[in-house]
Regions:
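Positively biased amphipathic helices and basic secretion/translocation or surface-docking motifs
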Residues: 1-15, 57-110
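Short, amphipathic alpha-helical interaction patch
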Residues: 1-47, 59-62
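Surface-exposed flexible segments
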Residues: 16, 40-43, 53, 417-419, ...
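Class I S-adenosyl-L-methionine
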Residues: 37, 54, 358-361
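Detector for the c-type heme attachment site
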Residues: 48-52
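Short amphipathic alpha-helical segments enriched in hydrophobics
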Residues: 54, 98, 182-185
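Beta-propeller domains
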Residues: 111-562
Length: 562
């Protein structure tokens, strides 16, 4: 960016072009640092350079000292191409280092920088149709409705998801945007969409500090939105949660009054009996890679303890029952070779590892600092658990988990291959054996149960299938569908998202209430909020709320009643 009165110059040719490394290394004087920071506000190329160079210190932690120094030219086994800049050289050497490491998972991994690539050529599907982002925020009041909104639905329906602000980068790591509706007295009072304005929203913050520790304020907050102890939290699993208001404005990072020095999973579990919120943090370079936390019904953090896992695995979800907490240690591991040679937003830095034993870790809720028991299972990966519950019978005590299971995940790249299907795991606490059985062969994702029955034997679970919602009767092991096809049998559009159950006031029956979901119509390129009567799941929706804009595909959300 030229100074006032100066002609345009080629990128990198201005007066500040050589200041980036000195700034990152802390070598600028106070006056020069302030001048350079003022310049960064308006100069994209310098901001990108600083973001790139910030990765150098964590990268060095991956390498032996002799790997950083230029190799002996006589050593033909060291194939490091001539590189004009330090970072490229370090990347090349680090790639070689990870390739020859005898035990790559013992390396200290460092996530790459926020430098982006052209996702149109790498992940074209994530920029077309309903994966395309929307580019502004709006508010609309008194939305048109087809049908009738049940008068007792008074509250907010909120859903979070990635909404990239540029044409670059993987869709999954786009900035979080919450789409919300306020329902009251049979009206759709308002619709709002708002970005979650984290501290790294305007000025990207590297996810790791120079010493390899995590920067918990570096967040895109794009995965889930939950309410607990009077606070609404936007979540992304490698950072602190961010609190938002009832009007969806960002209030700031939330660390439980300074007590939480860890990230928070995007899938916390709120016990319907005690009101406690259970969650874990993951993503630490150093051990412990995972820690378990518990907050009481008033939002006070009461328990924090490490969970012993041997490597930095991708742990996205976990399970809570009346008596137990269950963690999944599955063979999808952080791969430093991918992390230091690929942009994080181009290729997610996790790879399948055949040598890592898949297992489930069980912790008693009444002994939160006690020993975990580990149970081996067949290799697989699970993003989402539908539900879990305890069983006591003549054959012994057990824990049942109903999960959406992939046979494997990301062996060679972070492209999605096989679909997930519904499976049941039964952990026999007496014999130590896990019984694994497939319940259905349909490809489904984003399962939900009635949240009031989380941790107990809920009868119904609803998941997203191909052009349909699939409801499983988990007592009878049967399924029915609410289809959104083009055959005219239903007038709703064709692509539903996660369905959230909103119970009827004063009713405990799982069929007394409604499923809420955003549904995308590819013909009109628009979206509706669809309300389905749980007692007439296959029938027409009772209401379709016409939204003023398309709601892109996203992840998770919740119904928050008054």
């Amino acid at each position: 960016m030229p100074r006032d009165g100066e002609p345009d110059m080629p990128q990198g040719a201005h007066d500040f072009a050589m200041w980036d490394a000195a700034y990152v290394l802390g070598a600028l004087s106070d006056a020069d640092r302030l001048e350079f920071e003022a310049h960064l506000v308006g100069c994209i190329s310098c901001r990108e350079a600083v973001t790139e160079l910030t990765a150098v210190s964590p990268l060095l932690s991956l390498l032996d000292y002799d790997q950083v120094i230029a190799p002996d030219a006589s050593d033909e086994s060291v194939a490091v191409p001539p590189c004009p800049d330090l970072l490229t050289s370090l990347l090349a050497k680090a790639e070689q280092r990870s390739a020859v490491a005898s035990d790559p998972v013992e390396l200290r991994p460092a996530l790459m920088t926020a430098t982006t690539v052209d996702a149109q050529t790498v992940f074209p599907v994530f920029r077309t149709g309903n994966y395309a982002p929307v580019h502004d925020e709006l508010t609309a009041f008194d939305l048109p409705v087809e049908g009738s909104i049940p008068a007792e639905l008074n509250g907010w329906y909120l859903r979070n998801g990635p909404n990239p602000r540029t044409g670059a980068g993987h869709w999954c790591v786009g900035d979080g945007m919450v789409h919300g509706l306020r329902l009251e007295n049979g009206r759709a009072a308002w619709y709002r969409n708002r970005w979650v304005r984290t501290e790294s929203f305007e000025h990207p913050i590297p996810p790791y500090n120079d010493d390899g520790s995590r920067n918990l304020h570096s967040s895109i907050a794009n995965t889930h939105v939950v309410r607990h102890a009077g606070k609404t939290l936007a979540l992304m699993e490698f950072s602190l949660p961010y609190e938002i208001s009832n009007d969806l404005e960002t209030l700031g990072a939330y660390d439980f009054g300074g007590k939480l020095a860890d990230s928070m999973t995007a899938h916390p579990k709120i016990c319907p009996t005690t009101g406690e919120m259970h969650f874990f943090g993951s993503g630490n370079i150093f051990e412990p890679h995972v820690s378990y936390h518990r907050a009481d019904a008033d939002g006070r953090l009461t328990i924090s303890r490490p969970i012993d896992v041997p490597a930095l695995t991708l742990m996205h979800d976990f399970a809570l029952t009346a008596d137990h907490v269950v963690f999944m240690d599955l063979p999808l591991l952080f791969d430093p070779g991918v992390a230091i040679t690929q942009q994080f937003d181009r290729d997610l830095p996790y790879r399948w590892d055949d040598q890592h034993q898949a297992r489930l870790g069980v912790l008693r809720r009444d002994d939160p600092y006690g020993r975990l028991r580990w149970f081996d299972i067949d290799p697989c990966f699970v993003f989402h658990i539908a539900n879990a519950y305890d069983v006591t019978s003549a054959s012994g005590d057990s824990i049942v988990l109903e999960v959406l299971r992939y046979p494997e995940m990301w062996r060679d790249s972070s492209e999605f291959g096989d679909d997930a299907a519904l499976w049941r795991w039964k952990i026999n606490l007496d014999t130590g054996v896990v019984e694994e059985s497939q319940l259905d062969d349909r490809g489904v994702e984003f399962p939900r149960v009635d949240d009031r029955l989380a941790g107990s034997a809920a009868r119904y679970s609803v998941a997203v299938g191909s052009g349909a919602l699939v409801r499983y009767d988990l007592q009878r092991d049967t399924a029915t569908e609410h289809r959104f096809g083009a055959d005219g049998s239903h007038r709703a559009p064709s692509a539903p998202g996660e369905a959230v159950f909103a119970p009827a006031v004063g009713q405990s029956d799982e069929l007394a209430g409604w499923y809420l979901t955003y549904v995308y119509d590819p013909v009109t390129d628009g979206s509706d909020l669809v309300v389905i009567d749980a007692s007439d799941f296959e029938g027409d929706p009772v209401a379709r709320i016409r939204l003023p804009r398309r709601v892109p595909h996203g992840f998770h959300g919740n119904w928050i009643p008054d």
